[in-house]
């Protein structure tokens, strides 16, 4: 199987926090570096089994601000 790979410059990635609720209604979060909120959602679904099985459990995807050091 031949996969096409895209090279995305690291400078274009931004930190996103994906908030979701589990079956006990506890609010949890995962953080990802992504180009946009949609990609952050896809990454969350790929790396978090609960979100993969319950994609509608996501209730917020927020882009975090980085202050220049």
Language-model features: where?
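Basic/aromatic-rich interaction segments and small domains that mediate binding to polyanionic partners
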Residues: 13-17, 39-46
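Compositionally biased, low-structure terminal segments
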Residues: 7, 21, 33, 48-51
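Short aromatic-glycine-(Arg/Gly/Cys) micro-motifs in beta-strand/loop hairpins
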Residues: 5-28
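A short, exposed loop/beta-hairpin motif centered on an aromatic-Gly-Thr core
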Residues: 26-39
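Short, mixed-charge low-complexity intrinsically disordered segments
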Residues: 2-4, 46-69
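A general, composition-driven signal for non-globular sequence regions
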Residues: 1, 15, 20, 35, ...
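Intrinsically disordered, low-complexity regions enriched in serine, threonine, proline
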Residues: 11, 24, 38, 59-60
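A general secondary-structure boundary signal
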Residues: 19-22, 37, 65-68
